[in-house]
């Protein structure tokens, strides 16, 4: 498993039969702002994990992963299992069909600078999730209820976790 070093676009975009989530171009200026916000607040996320706050809820991070072919890349959410010397020990939550870069039950290490976004979903109140906020903003009003249900969203919060 190799993580992407640049902010290139995923080859796993939005399919016609999957209206809820869409591929966002990595050159989108709003996405750049969202990723910057996530990076600036990542220490709060890590502090919450270390302190055991919200420990009954999954702590997840988003990163870019390369497949066997370096042209094969995907930006996905993975579960934070533990911290090791400042790095994040993670495992996949869902692997896109056909993606060869990750295996179920695989553990891997992400450096903090590889994290694109982070999230804690506490009974529908989402801490972080800056790329999700943008994805929801880009979703039509008709699709927002489905989007919210899919991610279990009640509201976003800007409070520290």
Question: Where are these predicted regions, by residue range?
Answer:
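Mixed-charge, low-complexity intrinsically disordered regions
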Residues: 1-161
